[in-house]
């Protein structure tokens, strides 16, 4: 009897972990966008007017729970919880629920950035949250949950990142560290996540996952409800989980401890793709991109060029401030069949703490758009750059087609096919790429979706004529506005 029960439990755990890697995308859609710090009402409108029609699969939204109000309203205040009430600068619970429903109705899934590791850091005196809840973080008193000091690990500072105890039981940058082995803490976290599932979300991005023991997270994940069938999810669907685990390959707490529980953020992807398109590594080496570079297996890796944290750091990571290289890196990211892809949608920043665009009363303002659909009032909206949303369409068009026809010049000019459905070429050299290349596409004329769009049968940018052998003449000048060209079967003139 015991052996049967144990086997049954292990099988259930295995099936749950496998299910938690499924993002529940509609049809052939397969790209997530992080609409960082957007309001819920604006996200709902964006799903209906842009993301759905452009074929985006889902949105990662900023934390939904009540947070501390910090002076100047820096973005990171959202990562300092006061309670699990669904009231933030992005909106209230009613507005959040309306957004989730409207996005699901147009095939765009919602993934919530959730904070299970900690509550707010120290605050002088009584802190007031975005829903008006009072707390005394220094005393570890959060009546809005409620949590008291007994629900937290003892106060200590992380001084040695090679010490597992410190990494997982001390306070990350002073944030009060919850004890996830506590039955009470577990129950409150599960209750919070289950409420979001009831409202129709498809899954969660788990912040600071490496700072929590994997066995505690496994318990929490396995205790969650199935996704809400009223929002179009099949019966017995499990929430998609992707976990923030920063692992550069030499960490005491490894990404491998979490990869079977759900997807894991592959930070090495971000660093190495930045190195390549900054010119620090020849593009020819990208032929073995993915597990050949020591990355996680494709289905366990959440991949990105930059995220809301590392785009603010110096180093190899590319961001919107290097637009030509950034668009090339994003095109490669979305064209190469590796990982679960997420693109960034930022707001402009001058320093690490810059808040999102806000009015004189410190209320987040809605994005505004010019005649081309680009954002103009402090929002960057990379997802609205033609070169990026066109590659979301490219990724949808080629879907599961394999890499074929790799070509390179031994340096920084490369091209490859995605079966007979798509073709990409890149030029990161200081001289032109002018070459007859195998596009692997059926004969015909194709619109380069990077330089233009196919409108009423005509291409507004470059076009390439492919002969009966699949070859076409490819030209990317060293001083072209974009260093990449993309063709696919859904953009045939």
From Swiss-Prot:
Residues 1-19 form the signal peptide. The active site is at residues 207, 244. GO terms for molecular function: alpha-amylase activity; metal ion binding. Disulfide bonds join 47-103, 156-170, 375-381, 417-440, 447-459. The keyword Metal-binding applies. The modification Pyrrolidone carboxylic acid is found at residue 20. The record marks 309 as: Transition state stabilizer. Its cofactor is Ca(2+); chloride. It holds the Pfam family Alpha-amylase_C. CDD domains: AmyAc_bac_euk_AmyA. Binds 1 Ca(2+) ion per subunit. It catalyses: Endohydrolysis of (1->4)-alpha-D-glucosidic linkages in polysaccharides containing three or more (1->4)-alpha-linked D-glucose units. Keywords: Calcium, Carbohydrate metabolism, Chloride, Disulfide bond, Glycosidase, Hydrolase, Metal-binding, Pyrrolidone carboxylic acid, Secreted, Signal. It is found in: Secreted. Ca(2+) binds at residues 117, 168, 177, 211. It is an enzyme of class 3 (hydrolase). It comes from the Eukaryota. GO terms for biological process: carbohydrate metabolic process. One of its GO terms (cellular component) is extracellular region. Its EC number is 3.2.1.1. The keyword Signal applies. Chloride binds at residues 205, 307, 342. Monomer. Belongs to the glycosyl hydrolase 13 family. This is Alpha-amylase-related protein. It comes from Drosophila mauritiana (Fruit fly). The gene is Amyrel.
């Amino acid at each position: 009897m015991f052996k049967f029960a144990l086997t049954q439990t292990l099988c259930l755990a295995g099936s749950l972990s496998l299910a938690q890697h499924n993002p529940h995308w509609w049809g052939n859609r397969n790209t997530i966008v992080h609409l960082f710090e957007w309001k819920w009402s604006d996200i709902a409108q964006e799903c209906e007017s842009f993301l759905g029609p452009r074929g985006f699969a889902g949105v990662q939204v900023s934390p939904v729970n009540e947070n501390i109000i910090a002076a100047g309203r820096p973005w990171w205040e959202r990562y300092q919880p006061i309670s699990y009430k669904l009231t933030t600068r992005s909106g209230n619970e009613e507005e959040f629920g309306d957004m989730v429903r409207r996005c699901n109705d147009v095939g765009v899934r919602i993934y919530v950035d959730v904070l299970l590791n900690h509550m707010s850091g120290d605050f002088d005196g009584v802190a007031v949250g975005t829903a008006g809840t009072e707390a005394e973080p220094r005393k570890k008193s959060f009546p809005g949950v409620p949590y008291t000091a007994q629900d937290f690990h003892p106060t200590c500072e992380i001084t040695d990142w090679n010490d597992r105890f410190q990494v997982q039981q001390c306070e990350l940058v002073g944030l009060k560290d919850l004890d996830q082995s506590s039955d009470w803490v577990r129950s409150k976290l599960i209750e919070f996540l289950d409420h979001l599932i009831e409202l129709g979300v498809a899954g969660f991005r788990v912040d600071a996952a490496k700072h929590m023991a994997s066995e505690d997270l496994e318990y929490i994940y396995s205790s969650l409800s199935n996704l809400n069938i009223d929002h179009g999810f099949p019966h017995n669907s499990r929430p998609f989980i992707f976990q923030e685990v920063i692992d550069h390959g030499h960490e005491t707490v490894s990404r491998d401890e979490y990869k079977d529980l759900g997807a894991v953020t592959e930070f090495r992807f971000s660093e190495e793709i930045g190195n390549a398109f900054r010119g620090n590594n020849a593009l020819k080496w990208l032929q073995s991109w993915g597990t050949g570079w020591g990355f996680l297996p494709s289905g366990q890796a959440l991949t990105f060029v930059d995220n809301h944290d590392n785009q603010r750091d110096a180093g190899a990571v590319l961001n919107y401030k290097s637009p030509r290289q950034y668009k090339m890196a994003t095109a490669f990211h979305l064209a190469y069949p590796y990982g679960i892809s997420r693109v960034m949608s930022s707001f402009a920043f001058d320093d690490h703490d810059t808040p999102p665009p806000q009015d004189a009363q410190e209320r987040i303002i809605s994005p505004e758009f010019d005649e081309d659909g680009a954002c103009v009032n402090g929002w960057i909206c990379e997802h609205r750059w033609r070169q990026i949303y066109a590659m979301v369409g490219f990724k949808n068009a080629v879907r599961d087609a394999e890499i074929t026809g790799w070509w390179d010049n031994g340096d920084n000019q490369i091209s490859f096919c995605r079966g007979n459905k798509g073709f990409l070429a890149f030029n990161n050299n200081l001289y032109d790429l002018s070459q007859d290349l195998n596009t692997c596409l059926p004969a015909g004329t194709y619109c380069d979706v990077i330089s233009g769009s196919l409108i009423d049968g005509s291409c507004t940018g470059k076009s390439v004529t492919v002969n009966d052998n699949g070859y076409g003449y490819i030209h990317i000048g060293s001083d072209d506005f974009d260093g990449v060209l993309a063709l696919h079967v859904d953009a045939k003139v």
